[in-house]
Swiss-Prot record:
Biased composition (Polar residues): 307-328
Subcellular localization, as worded in the UniProt entry: Nucleus
UniProtKB keywords: Developmental protein, DNA-binding, Homeobox, Nucleus, Transcription, Transcription regulation
Biological classification of the source: Eukaryota, Metazoa, Chordata, Craniata, Vertebrata
Protein name: Homeobox protein Hox-D1
Motif (Antp-type hexapeptide): 204-209
Function, as annotated: Sequence-specific transcription factor which is part of a developmental regulatory system that provides cells with specific positional identities on the anterior-posterior axis. Acts on the anterior body structures.
Family annotation (Pfam families): Homeodomain (PF00046)
Gene Ontology biological process terms from the UniProt entry: embryonic skeletal system development; neuron differentiation; sensory perception of pain
DNA-binding region: 229-288
GO cellular component: nucleoplasm; nucleus
Species per Swiss-Prot/TrEMBL record: Mus musculus
Length: 328
């Protein structure tokens, strides 16, 4: 309020009957060319030290103070005691006995659907300019306070209001300064998630990935019956296979305690270790059988040419009596 109103103290001293007080002056935008200072007198007499209030509100025509009618002297009617700083509004007469002036004479807005606003800020329904309305009912106190509770149109004084058009009241009835302002989409960039900023190599290493075969799905047979799904085969990692092969090299058969210990070390269960050793023993027996057959075949192929060229067999055949003597 200090940017629009200025308080000028022109008090001359208060106790010796001198008139002292405060002069309330508005900025030039509040007054028209024909504005004249008007003395505002409260409805009750002020005490010592309280001066009159002078305002620069524009008046259409000057109203002379009507003189009281001449008649027989009457005893003054006692007035009820009023508080020292009772509110004195502008809606009544400026001077005692003067007729109340309409709101149009002071350049104030009247009440109507176009200017019916629930808050202190508003605009006309059919106007595009910035019109800020303040209250017309003013309250003055002895200390120089100035309160507003009605509506004043800055557009009536020929200048735009001090507030921009973005603070105008929306059509739904909520005040402009109190409504929630939502930013435009894309105005505030969204922070990237921490998982998206990290590269894929830092989240999972290659050696952590254990390749598993996809489980087989049951297929429909010719008669529409589904075949039972086969058991899922466990894919061991390189580290697990190395440890199992090393253990199999020393022990072909494991005890239950040793099997549980190996399963805990390799993050496997007891059944997986047991089945692996069974399959490994069967593979070893198969290799041995294949190896024995290959060894026997190689030995037979080596001994066969030696038996054909043996001198003993050839001498026996040559020196045999059946072959030496033939019947004549």
């Amino acid at each position: 309020m200090s940017s629009y109103l200025e308080y000028v103290s022109c008090a001359a001293g208060g106790g010796s009957g001198g008139v002292g007080g405060d002069v309330l002056g508005f900025a030039p935008k509040f007054c028209r060319a024909d504005a004249r200072p008007v003395a505002l007198q409260p409805a009750f007499p002020l005490g010592s030290g309280d001066g009159a209030f002078v305002s620069c509100l524009p008046l259409a025509t000057a109203r002379p103070t009507p003189s009281p009618p001449a008649g027989p002297a009457q005893s003054p009617v006692p007035q009820p005691a009023a508080p020292r700083y009772a509110p004195c509004t502008l809606e009544g007469a400026y001077e005692r006995g003067a007729a109340p002036a309409s709101a149009a004479e002071y350049g104030f807005l009247g009440s109507g659907p176009a200017f019916d606003f629930p808050g202190a800020l508003g605009r006309a329904a059919d106007e595009g300019g910035a019109h800020v309305h303040y209250a017309t009912s003013a309250v003055f106190s002895g200390g120089g306070s100035f309160l507003l509770s009605g509506q004043v149109d800055f557009a009536a004084f020929g200048e735009p209001g001090p507030f921009p058009a973005c603070l105008k009241e929306p059509a739904d009835g909520h005040p402009g300064p109190f409504q929630t302002v939502s930013p435009a989409p894309g105005a505030c960039p969204k922070p990237a998630s921490p998982t998206s900023s990290l590269p894929a190599a830092h989240s999972t290493f290659e050696w952590m990935k254990v390749k598993r075969n996809a489980p087989k799905k049951s297929k429909l047979s010719e008669y529409g019956a589904t075949s039972p799904p086969s058991a899922i085969r466990t894919n061991f990692s390189t580290k697990q296979l190395t440890e199992l092969e090393k253990e199999f090299h020393f022990n072909k058969y494991l005890t239950r305690a040793r099997r549980i210990e190996i399963a805990n070390c390799l993050q496997l269960n007891d059944t997986q270790v047991k089945i692996w050793f069974q399959n490994r023993r069967m593979k070893q027996k198969k290799r041995e059988r294949e190896g024995l057959l290959a060894t026997a075949a190689s030995v037979a192929s080596i001994k066969l040419p030696r038996s054909e060229t043996s001198p003993i067999k050839s001498g026996r055949n040559l020196g045999s009596p059946s072959q030496a003597q033939e019947p004549s």
